[in-house]
UniProtKB/Swiss-Prot annotation:
This is Enolase. Belongs to the enolase family. (2R)-2-phosphoglycerate binds at residues 162, 340, 369-370, 391. Pathway: Carbohydrate degradation; glycolysis; pyruvate from D-glyceraldehyde 3-phosphate: step 4/5. It is an enzyme of class 4 (lyase). It comes from the Bacteria. One of its GO terms (biological process) is glycolytic process. Binds a second Mg(2+) ion via substrate during catalysis. It is found in: Cytoplasm; Secreted; Cell surface. It catalyses: (2R)-2-phosphoglycerate = phosphoenolpyruvate + H2O. Its EC number is 4.2.1.11. The gene is eno. It comes from Porphyromonas gingivalis (strain ATCC 33277 / DSM 20709 / CIP 103683 / JCM 12257 / NCTC 11834 / 2561). GO terms for cellular component: cell surface; extracellular region; phosphopyruvate hydratase complex.
Length: 425
């Protein structure tokens, strides 16, 4: 079925910033629609998000240039192509852009088109998006990694690490895992309230209280887990996104950037030792960006120290890019990759990164961005790739709930065939 029209438009994301939405129209009248997310802390090797830089509009964050590229460059190039040729369409987008970083058309323009094409194709075939992307062997519902305390660049809280998450690994199914997470979230609200701390939420729906550093955040979560009636380490484990690239400079991890005078300055070896200490002390089973994207030696050391104990997720390190992932596999840096579709710019390249990771024994975590929309594509991608893990925020804000609710629908649709969570053989 051929594409007859592609329309791009400027909409707003969950932070009130402009982003790109794309409609792909087919000759039969079907429309596929996708909206593009945006990150606050971004890896320096991510594909380029095209912004207008016009300070008179949206503080320079407008996306009219990207929208124009959709309507005037991509539309005429793709019209007439079969919507079922996802790989060929994505290859055409890459050729049209002609740069490694997607800086001509903008990764936001390209991704909007790529995802909308997939959604239109699924609608044309009258099958769910996860089934269209993944084929018949798609049945794994992901363990949610719920960001219930925000720090770093995602909040004003004086904590260097960006995210403290809970993982309901002891649940029997996704629905129960979601319930467990919600109950802990509400228990944490009471824990914080009883201490006179703020229960306002950050970009991803987690709380952003003025806690006394990393250990205070972890212990507050453990208290909430127990208050909700669950056993830490058995029912629910803890994951962290350190976002270390945000405070790494000249070989030093400088916690004072976010924590003020209370923060420490740690060398590479001291950073590895600190994370190892935290894993020994608390039920932590996943650490994202424990070392900076430019600290490959540090990543090697961290992997030697903790690689057989916990999941070490590369986000800024790999930026959903097979080139960086290939290096990480070869140099034994990390054992997992975070998947963010807008880091690379097309669905095909995203799936290639996931496939490479799984082929080499790495896990993958399908992820949102801090600036989100009501688009639920990543929920389908998580199931389509049997990744078994999804990171899509806390238990508040509709832009986050949209993904969880889509996963509830998918689990219901799969029925007894659904399996909950990634299990490493």
């Amino acid at each position: 079925m051929e594409i007859v029209k592609i329309i791009g438009r400027e909409i707003l994301d969950s932070r009130g910033n402009p982003t790109v939405e794309v409609d792909v129209h087919l000759a039969c009248g079907i429309i596929g629609r996708a909206a593009v997310p945006s990150g606050a802390s971004t890896g320096e090797n991510e594909a380029i998000e095209l912004r207008d830089q016009d300070k008179a509009r949206y503080c320079g964050k407008g996306v009219l240039k990207a929208v124009k590229n959709v309507n005037e460059v991509i539309d005429p190039a793709l019209c007439g192509m079969s919507v079922l040729e996802q790989t060929a369409i994505d290859r055409k987008l890459i050729e049209l852009d002609g740069t490694k970083t997607k800086s001509n058309l903008g990764a936001n323009a390209m991704l909007g088109v790529s995802l909308a094409v997939a959604k239109a194709a699924a609608a044309y075939l009258d099958i769910p998006l996860y089934r269209y992307i993944g084929g018949s062997n798609t049945y794994v519902l992901p363990v949610p990694m719920m960001n219930i305390i925000n720090g770093g660049s995602h909040s004003d809280a004086p904590i260097a690490f960006q995210e403290f998450m809970i993982r309901p690994v002891g649940a029997c199914c996704f629905r129960e895992g979601l319930r467990m997470g919600a109950e802990v979230f509400h228990a944490l609200k009471k824990v914080l309230h009883d201490r006179g701390l703020s229960t306002a939420v950050g970009d991803e729906g987690g709380f952003a209280p003025a806690l006394n550093g990393t250990e205070d955040a972890i212990e507050s979560i453990l208290k909430a887990v127990e208050a909700a009636g669950y056993v830490p380490g058995k029912d629910i484990t803890i994951a962290m996104d350190c976002a270390s690239s945000e405070f790494f400079k000249d070989g030093i991890y400088d916690y004072t950037k976010f924590e003020g005078e209370k923060g420490k300055k740690r060398s590479i070896d001291e950073q590895v030792a600190y994370l190892t200490e935290l894993v020994g002390k608390y039920p932590i089973d996943s650490i994202e960006d424990g070392m900076s994207e430019n600290d490959w030696e540090g990543w090697k050391k961290l992997t030697v120290a903790l690689g057989d104990k916990v999941q070490l997720v590369g986000d800024d390190l790999f930026v959903t890019n097979v080139e960086f992932l290939r290096r990480g596999i070869a140099e034994k840096c990390g054992n997992s990759i975070l998947i963010k579709v807008n880091q690379i710019g097309t669905l095909t390249e995203t799936l290639n990164a996931i496939e490479m990771a799984h082929r080499h024994g790495f896990t993958s975590v399908t992820s949102h961005r801090s600036g989100e929309t009501e688009d639920t594509t990543i929920a389908d991608i998580a199931v389509a790739t049997n990744s078994g893990q999804i990171k899509t925020g806390s238990l508040s804000r509709t832009d986050r709930m949209a993904k969880y609710n889509q996963l509830l629908r998918i689990e219901e649709e799969l029925g007894p065939c659904a399996v909950y969570g990634y299990k490493k053989v």
